[in-house]
Regions:
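Short N-terminal helix/helix-N-cap motif within the alpha/beta-hydrolase-1
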Residues: 176-180, 207
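A short glycine-rich, Lys/Arg-flanked "PGG" loop and its adjoining helix->strand segment in the class I
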Residues: 179-194
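Substrate-binding/catalytic lobe of Class I Rossmann-like enzymes that use SAM or dcSAM, i.e.
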Residues: 234-298
Length: 353
């Protein structure tokens, strides 16, 4: 997939202007070379992959080996996230009880269901998920017995006004049309419902790739974890307000990671992974060899490896409740007020009034 060098005709998702121009060439394994475009309208500057990827592109990227440490792409060490999601669910369940004693909760982008499974065991809420990865949906159903719609949110056609709480953690940066996605989220939420949304700080996300483009012409920076949209605080708040949400709170989190990604300290900068152009094209040619929904036995084998990885990373300390509070305190110290943008991620709480 090769980006044209001129302006894109399709309008910017944030400001509505059509002047999106190529900014940084990046590599998306199994898809090819793509371009992060930038809106050149004054005071906008929104960055996004253009032309837009397709749903088949996303399905190829989020195949079963997206969660495999041996993969050239995807989320490395995902099994080790299991313990973090146990902690997150413990404190989220507490917040849910303070909000309402019970209700319906939807996680969009539920991955392998680590958070949903833990929430189901820590609260009286009814939980379900939406996940584009067929392996992710399969794993969640088989390991936790939960309802998961293997789809994008827009294609799931969920009932209007049906959820009391929505979680979108590390999700909005992956969707093809963020404004349309937020409108659909608003539609399925009941009046008074809330959403917890966490998405990367676009400047911190793009910064390492902007620096890497000055390297060898035979190498391309890899688009880590397949992010396709890059939001600043201003972009995010504008989209949320214009799609009907009331913002209740916003934090900038991940101070240390953000400083490294932004390159604030010259000798302490994060460097992105790079891939040779020939190796990138090899991943595209191998796209047809990915597992399909019919590969149930391969799914079982991959799931068993994931279970063993979780078990190997387990320890009594990580299951100890005082350790939960210690990690919670560390995260609080790694957060910034909403007016500051040095962190890696934005953490937003919104409500449908």
């Amino acid at each position: 997939m090769v980006q044209d060098t001129g302006m894109t005709a399709e309008a910017c998702d944030v400001c509505g202007d059509g002047s999106m121009v190529p900014h940084v060439e990046v590599a998306l394994p199994r898809v090819g070379s793509v371009w992060i475009n930038r809106c050149v309208r004054n005071a906008c500057g929104f960055r996004q992959i253009r032309p837009r990827l397709t749903v088949p592109d996303l399905s190829a990227f989020y195949s079963a080996d997206y969660f495999d440490d041996a993969s050239q792409a995807g989320f490395q060490g995902y099994a080790r996230q299991w313990h973090r999601y146990q902690r997150d669910a413990y404190f989220l369940a507490r917040d849910l009880r303070a909000f309402r004693s019970r209700g319906r909760l939807l996680e969009v982008g539920s991955a392998l269901g680590f958070l949903l499974g833990a929430l189901a065991g820590n609260s009286d809420w009814t939980v379900e998920g939406v996940e584009i990865s067929s392996f992710g949906a399969w794993y969640t159903r088989n390991r936790f017995g939960l309802t998961v719609h293997q789809s994008t949110l827009e294609a799931a056609h969920l009932q209007s006004n049906s959820f009391d709480f929505v979680i979108q953690k590390d999700l909005l940066e992956h969707v093809l049309e963020p404004r349309r996605h937020l409108e659909e989220t608003f539609r399925i939420m009941r009046p008074g419902a809330r959403m917890r949304l966490i998405t990367p700080n676009g400047d911190a996300d793009v910064g390492p790739m902007e620096r890497a483009r000055l390297g060898s012409p035979s190498e391309i920076p890899v688009l880590e974890q397949g992010h396709v949209s890059f939001f600043t605080r201003r972009h995010l708040l504008r989209l949320l307000n214009e799609t009907g949400f009331t913002v209740l709170g916003l934090r900038n989190i991940g101070l240390r990671r953000g400083i490294r990604a932004l390159g604030v300290v010259p000798f302490w900068q994060r460097r992105p992974a790079v891939i040779l152009r020939d190796d990138l094209m090899r991943t595209v040619r191998n796209r047809n060899e990915l597992m399909t929904d019919a590969d149930v036995e391969k799914y079982r084998q991959r799931a068993e490896r994931m279970d063993k990885e979780i078990e190997r990373s387990s320890s009594w300390l990580r299951r100890w409740k005082p350790y939960y509070y210690y990690r919670y305190l560390v995260k609080c110290c790694d957060a910034l007020p909403s007016s500051m943008t040095f962190g890696q991620d934005f953490d937003v709480l919104v409500q449908k009034v």
